[in-house]
Curated annotation (Swiss-Prot):
The lineage of its organism: Bacteria, Pseudomonadati, Pseudomonadota, Gammaproteobacteria, Pseudomonadales. The outer membrane component of an antibiotic efflux pump. Confers resistance to numerous structurally unrelated antibiotics such as carbenicillin, chloramphenicol, erythromycin, novobiocin, streptomycin and tetracycline. Is not involved in organic solvent efflux. The keyword Transport applies. The keyword Cytoplasm does not apply. Its main location: membrane. It is found in: Cell outer membrane. GO terms for molecular function: efflux transmembrane transporter activity. Belongs to the outer membrane factor (OMF) (TC 1.B.17) family. This is Antibiotic efflux pump outer membrane protein ArpC. A lipid is attached at residue 18 (N-palmitoyl cysteine). InterPro entries: OMF (IPR050737), OMP_efflux (IPR003423), RND_efflux_OM_lipoprot_NodT (IPR010131).
Length: 484
């Protein structure tokens, strides 16, 4: 009987080679072969290390930011959920993969029963006993048309997509922490600037008020000076609030409070980031985890079509066991007590009111939906990189122009202050110079923040943020298929 069971298993594996999964072909990328060109774009440069392979410790120069990113990778809850989802999909794949193999189980049972005389065939009451021990396979499906293999393939692709989703979550987290940190730094700089400007306005207001008391300045001059003071106080409260909210945002991203031993930050206008190469549009197909995730989900939908097709064909399941049966426990394994069971079952769909056809149509529609999602993901990635490349050059020019504007306003302010104090110009000219300088300085900080966040977003768009150190891509093995 053991040989019969073995032969049955071998036959099942041979017959299980058929698959109805459609041949998979990746859709054409619906984007241009080159990045956009024009006055807003810098010429793309090649590099030995792609942006996706550049470690975030080499990309971000600020030691405080590096410390915060490391903290977030340990404590962030979104990243923890993504890792747990990966474990869950791995377990689901292993569960589905187990259906490819017969589930062998051993069973032992025993019973004793008293039969009354009026129910006994002999007319006498008695006690009957029965003991059994069997080893067998229960309801094993012969995968003749690849239904189980299709479902296993679908579970595998879903698991692989969850691995890419975890990568996307980490890349997004690294960029989010960096952007939140730079926003915090910029708001602190704006708060400090406003604090200093408010003191200057208050000094000017007090000076104008004293001048009014001796008849030098008019009531209008006093009112204008007070307006500047109150406007600065509004900004002071605004930036004070923003700094506190920035800390709260960082705390959520970190999953814990900002470390008390946080390293000394770099100045906002220091060399904060390494420049990353754009490469070619085709590179992001292999390096963006969200694109890889979308393709794995497309492959999973393609595998589901195979399972839906297989449902049209007969399914055969086998139940078989062998063992011993005896009325006496002591003779259960004695010669002549052997027993066996072989019970095949076939299920042939005849009428189902069109549900199988509807299931197949649904699986094909789901594949078409995933094709559209895959193409949309590629288009979004292309746009994000293109936007980042346009921002790189234009922000450099804009920032330099804004620095020149600040310098011009500083010169204007010094001249206006000198002329006001010696009585050549009115207080109105001096206040105008103060406001212009304050506005230009605020804009400079805002432009620097926009430039930094744009570069961070470009690094993210190119797939950067997964590796801690440059060179890890060559050391880290690709994701392995989990074993059953």
């Amino acid at each position: 009987m053991t040989k019969s069971l073995l032969s049955l298993a071998v036959t099942a594996f041979i017959l299980g080679g058929c698959s109805l999964i459609p041949d998979y072909q990746a859709p054409e990328a619906p984007v241009a072969a080159q990045w956009p060109q024009g006055p807003a774009y810098s010429p793309t440069q090649s590099a030995d290390v792609a942006a996706a392979e550049q470690g975030w410790r080499q990309f971000f120069h600020d030691p405080a930011l590096q410390q915060l990113i490391q903290t977030s990778l340990v404590n962030n809850r979104d990243l923890r959920v993504a890792a747990l989802n990966l474990d869950a999909y791995r377990a689901q794949y292993r569960i589905q993969r187990a259906d490819l193999f017969p589930a062998v189980s051993a069973t032992g049972s025993g019973s004793r029963q008293r039969v009354p005389a009026n129910m006994s065939q002999t007319g006498e009451s008695g006690i009957t006993s029965q003991y059994s021990a069997t080893l067998g396979v229960s309801a094993y499906e012969l995968d003749l048309f690849g239904r189980v293999r299709s479902l296993t393939e679908q579970a595998l692709e879903t698991y692989l997509s969850s691995e890419q989703a975890r990568r996307s979550t980490q890349i997004a987290l690294v960029a989010s922490v960096a952007n939140a940190y730079y926003t915090w730094q910029a708001d602190q700089a704006l708060f400090k600037l406003t604090e200093e400007t408010l003191k200057t306005y208050e000094e000017s207001y007090n000076l104008t008020r004293r001048s009014n008391e001796v008849g030098v300045a008019s009531a209008l001059d006093v009112s204008q000076a007070r307006t500047a003071v109150e406007g600065a106080r509004v900004k002071y409260s605004q930036y004070q609030r923003l700094v506190a909210q920035d800390v709260n945002s960082l705390t959520v991203l970190l999953g814990t409070g900002i470390p008390a031993d946080l390293a000394k930050p770099l100045e906002l206008d220091a060399d904060q980031l390494a420049e990353v190469p754009a490469g070619l549009p085709s590179d992001i197909l292999q390096r963006r985890p969200d694109i890889q995730e979308a393709e794995h989900l497309l492959k999973a939908a393609n595998a589901n079509i195979g399972a839906a097709r297989a449902a049209f064909f007969p399914s055969i399941s086998l139940t078989a066991n062998a063992g011993s049966l005896s009325p006496d426990m002591g003779h259960l394994f004695s010669g002549g007590q052997g027993t066996w069971l072989f019970q095949p079952q076939i299920n042939l769909p005849i009428f189902n009111a069109g549900s199988l056809k509807a299931s197949l149509d649904y699986s094909k529609i789901q594949k078409d939906i995933n094709v559209a999602k895959y193409e949309k993901t590629i288009q979004t990635a292309f746009q994000e990189v293109s936007d980042g490349l346009a921002a790189r050059k234009t922000f450099e020019e804009q920032l330099q122009a804004q620095r020149d504007l600040v310098q011009a306003n500083q010169d204007y302010y010094r001249l206006a202050e000198r002329r006001y104090r010696i009585g050549i110009d009115s207080n109105l000219t001096f206040l105008d110079a103060q406001r212009n300088l304050f506005s230009a300085q605020q804009a400079l900080i805002g432009d620097r923040l926009s430039q930094l966040t744009s570069e961070v977003n470009l690094y993210k768009a190119l797939g950067g943020g997964w590796y801690e150190q440059t060179g890890q891509a060559n050391q880290q093995a690709s994701v392995e298929t989990p074993k059953g």
